[in-house]
Every structure is written in C-alpha cells, then in structure tokens.
C-alpha cells in the first residue's frame, strides 16, 4: 500500500475513534493503533504532523487536507539516501526512473550533465524528447523525422532559417 493510502486509511479510522493523550500506548487494540503500529517511523511522524503531536487533533480535518493534495500530488526523490532500490551508491537522491530499456521508458535527469533533461520513450515513432539539442537549449521534438507525416518539431534545425521556404506542415508558435 502506498504511503498516501495508508495515511488516508489511518486518518479515516482515526475519524471514527478519538485517540487521546498519546498515540497508541503499548497494548492498545483500536483499529487506529493497529494500523498506526504497522507504519514506519517516518510514516508515523507524517500522521502526527496532520493530527497533532499527541494524536489529539481532528482527524476529519486532517483527512480533508490529505484529500486536497491527493489527486495531483507527486514526490520525486527521498529525504534520505536509500541504497536498497538498486541504485548505485553515489547516485543522486532526486533521480527517478520508471522502467528500464522498455518502449514506455520514462526518465528524469542524468543526461550528460544536463539537469533539465526529460525523455519519454526510446527512439520509436512515439518518441518524445525535451532538451538536449546540440545548438539550441530550447529544443523540443515530438516523434521522429524519418518520413513520418505526423512529425512535429518546435525549434530550428539550422541557423540560416528562411521564412519564405516553409514546408506545407510548417507550425510556429510565437513571433
């Protein structure tokens, strides 16, 4: 279960049971304490941030705060270096990678020292790349050029651009 769902479930359970004084003394058997004891220390601290240090806050209000961030909330990286995720020991904690050499490969960061590099996919027709053009840092490309009528490109491939020699599928945004 993801942390967000665990915390949401915990706060929902806490809304039905009012926990007072301390969060779950040893031997407590409430549903809240059962779920709370399954969380890691970091997750327990996050729950206490929402419902108070002694878990005496209003769990319904805390749950509404959680729901407010839930649909669009994303976290990249970790607060501490974790070496059990298959990363190299000296890797950046803000590095995030989904997949590995698959067609649906998604990577943020780590492209020859360019911190703003973002790549979706590999070099197939639905390839999408932001950044990493040799001459232009504002380069943006959708698709591949090789005889694809759906190719779409933002930016110039050469410096001597001539406005009069536009192709039929020319597309420009801005001046």
Swiss-Prot record:
<keyword id="KW-0165">Cleavage on pair of basic residues</keyword>
<feature type="modified residue" description="Phenylalanine amide">
    <location>
        <position position="142"/>
    </location>
</feature>
<feature type="modified residue" description="Phenylalanine amide">
    <location>
        <position position="108"/>
    </location>
</feature>
<keyword id="KW-0677">Repeat</keyword>
<dbReference type="InterPro" id="IPR051041">
    <property type="entry name" value="FMRFamide-related_np"/>
</dbReference>
<dbReference type="GO" id="GO:0006972">
    <property type="term" value="P:hyperosmotic response"/>
</dbReference>
<protein>
    <recommendedName>
        <fullName>FMRFamide-like neuropeptides 1</fullName>
    </recommendedName>
</protein>
<feature type="modified residue" description="Phenylalanine amide">
    <location>
        <position position="173"/>
    </location>
</feature>
<feature type="modified residue" description="Phenylalanine amide">
    <location>
        <position position="130"/>
    </location>
</feature>
<feature type="modified residue" description="Phenylalanine amide">
    <location>
        <position position="154"/>
    </location>
</feature>
<comment type="function">
    <text>DPNFLRF-amide: Inhibits the activity of dissected pharyngeal myogenic muscle system.</text>
</comment>
<keyword id="KW-0027">Amidation</keyword>
<dbReference type="InterPro" id="IPR002544">
    <property type="entry name" value="FMRFamid-related_peptide-like"/>
</dbReference>
<feature type="propeptide">
    <location>
        <begin position="79"/>
        <end position="86"/>
    </location>
</feature>
<dbReference type="GO" id="GO:0046662">
    <property type="term" value="P:regulation of egg-laying behavior"/>
</dbReference>
<dbReference type="GO" id="GO:0006937">
    <property type="term" value="P:regulation of muscle contraction"/>
</dbReference>
<feature type="signal peptide">
    <location>
        <begin position="1"/>
        <end position="21"/>
    </location>
</feature>
<dbReference type="GO" id="GO:0007218">
    <property type="term" value="P:neuropeptide signaling pathway"/>
</dbReference>
<keyword id="KW-0964">Secreted</keyword>
<keyword id="KW-0527">Neuropeptide</keyword>
<feature type="modified residue" description="Phenylalanine amide">
    <location>
        <position position="120"/>
    </location>
</feature>
<dbReference type="GO" id="GO:0007638">
    <property type="term" value="P:mechanosensory behavior"/>
</dbReference>
<dbReference type="GO" id="GO:0007626">
    <property type="term" value="P:locomotory behavior"/>
</dbReference>
<feature type="propeptide">
    <location>
        <begin position="157"/>
        <end position="165"/>
    </location>
</feature>
<dbReference type="GO" id="GO:0005576">
    <property type="term" value="C:extracellular region"/>
</dbReference>
<feature type="propeptide">
    <location>
        <begin position="22"/>
        <end position="68"/>
    </location>
</feature>
<dbReference type="Pfam" id="PF01581">
    <property type="entry name" value="FARP"/>
</dbReference>
<dbReference type="GO" id="GO:1904014">
    <property type="term" value="P:response to serotonin"/>
</dbReference>
<comment type="similarity">
    <text>Belongs to the FARP (FMRFamide related peptide) family.</text>
</comment>
<dbReference type="GO" id="GO:0071855">
    <property type="term" value="F:neuropeptide receptor binding"/>
</dbReference>
<feature type="modified residue" description="Tyrosine amide">
    <location>
        <position position="76"/>
    </location>
</feature>
<keyword id="KW-0732">Signal</keyword>
<comment type="function">
    <text>Together with flp-18, plays a homeostatic role by acting on the GABAergic neural transmission at neuromuscular junctions to prevent overexcitation of the locomotor circuit.</text>
</comment>
<feature type="modified residue" description="Phenylalanine amide">
    <location>
        <position position="98"/>
    </location>
</feature>
């Amino acid at each position: 279960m993801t942390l967000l769902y665990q915390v949401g479930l915990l706060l929902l359970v806490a809304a039905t049971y009012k926990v007072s004084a301390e969060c779950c003394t040893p031997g407590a058997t409430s549903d809240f304490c059962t779920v709370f004891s399954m969380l890691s220390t970091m997750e327990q601290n996050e729950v206490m941030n929402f419902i108070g240090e002694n878990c005496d806050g209003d769990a319904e209000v805390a749950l509404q705060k959680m729901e407010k961030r839930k649909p669009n909330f994303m976290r990249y990286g970790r607060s501490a270096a974790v070496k059990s995720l298959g990363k190299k020991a000296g890797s950046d904690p803000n590095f995030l990678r989904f997949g590995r050499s698959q067609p649906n490969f998604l990577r943020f960061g780590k492209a020859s020292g360019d911190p703003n590099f973002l790549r979706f996919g590999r070099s197939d027709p639905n390839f999408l790349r932001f950044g990493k053009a040799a001459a232009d840092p504002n380069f943006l490309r959708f698709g591949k050029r090789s005889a694809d009528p759906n190719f779409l490109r933002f930016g110039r491939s050469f410096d001597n651009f001539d406005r009069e020699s536009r192709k039929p599928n020319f597309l420009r945004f801005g001046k």
